[in-house]
Amino acid sequence: MIAYVEGRLAEVAGNACVVVTDGGVGYEVFVPGHTLARLPDKGGRVSFFISTEVREDALELYGFATWDERQTFIVLTSISKVGAKTGLAILSQFRPDDLRRLVVEDDVLALTRVSGIGKKTAQHIFLELKYKLKVEDLPAAAPLVTGGAPGGVFRDALAGLANLGYGEEEASHVLKDVLHGEPDLDVGGALRAALRALARGR
């Protein structure tokens, strides 16, 4: 399963972009609207945490700037009647912390601002979110690309490496070395540095 993609931005079309890795492989990645608006010019470097959606006729990659956003997308698409396109539309309108606040504040109608979601569907989604979203993380659900407490950086980067197939012992050892040398790294930076170190060691 593809969980992380990093490379050069080759093309943007609609709500998707094409990322060409350093190995020359190009991936079409669908991203939320706010991420689309912040993409660099063609040729710039981009990186995404990936959720892979497999259908009978297609394999689609959905990319997110933070691990929290990716995990929220997975929660959303686990809800009946919420497909990948709807999940992406919701995350184009609301960040993960916004969704948690909606749950805490019991603001069902806010979801109807998302195109294609009526009141009945919003109520259904909201009911599921109450049980599936980690509202106890509010207000400090730190995004992977903006840093946070060192322990949180280590924990989230370790989870990212585990999802890429690395063993906990190996990944933990490399991450500790990385963060010892560069303690101010955010999660995205720590993950990239660890991946480079792991690649050199193999």
UniProtKB/Swiss-Prot annotation:
Residues 155-202 are annotated as: Domain III. Residues 1-65 are annotated as: Domain I. The keyword Glycosyltransferase does not apply. HAMAP family: DNA_HJ_migration_RuvA. One of its GO terms (cellular component) is Holliday junction resolvase complex. Has three domains with a flexible linker between the domains II and III and assumes an 'L' shape. Domain III is highly mobile and contacts RuvB. It comes from the Bacteria. Pfam families: HHH_5, RuvA_C, RuvA_N. Homotetramer. Forms an RuvA(8)-RuvB(12)-Holliday junction (HJ) complex. HJ DNA is sandwiched between 2 RuvA tetramers; dsDNA enters through RuvA and exits via RuvB. An RuvB hexamer assembles on each DNA strand where it exits the tetramer. Each RuvB hexamer is contacted by two RuvA subunits (via domain III) on 2 adjacent RuvB subunits; this complex drives branch migration. In the full resolvosome a probable DNA-RuvA(4)-RuvB(12)-RuvC(2) complex forms which resolves the HJ. Residues 145-155 are annotated as: Flexible linker. CDD domains: UBA_RuvA_C (cd14332). The RuvA-RuvB-RuvC complex processes Holliday junction (HJ) DNA during genetic recombination and DNA repair, while the RuvA-RuvB complex plays an important role in the rescue of blocked DNA replication forks via replication fork reversal (RFR). RuvA specifically binds to HJ cruciform DNA, conferring on it an open structure. The RuvB hexamer acts as an ATP-dependent pump, pulling dsDNA into and through the RuvAB complex. HJ branch migration allows RuvC to scan DNA until it finds its consensus sequence, where it cleaves and resolves the cruciform DNA. GO terms for biological process: DNA recombination; DNA repair. Keywords: Cytoplasm, DNA damage, DNA recombination, DNA repair, DNA-binding. The keyword DNA damage applies. GO terms for molecular function: ATP binding; four-way junction DNA binding; four-way junction helicase activity. It is found in: Cytoplasm. Belongs to the RuvA family. NCBIfam families: ruvA. InterPro entries: DNA_helicase_Holl-junc_RuvA_I, NA-bd_OB-fold, RuvA, RuvA_2-like, RuvA_C, RuvA_C_sf. This is Holliday junction branch migration complex subunit RuvA. It comes from Nitratidesulfovibrio vulgaris (strain ATCC 29579 / DSM 644 / CCUG 34227 / NCIMB 8303 / VKM B-1760 / Hildenborough) (Desulfovibrio vulgaris). SUPFAM superfamilies: DNA helicase RuvA subunit, C-terminal domain, Nucleic acid-binding proteins, RuvA domain 2-like. Residues 66-144 are annotated as: Domain II.
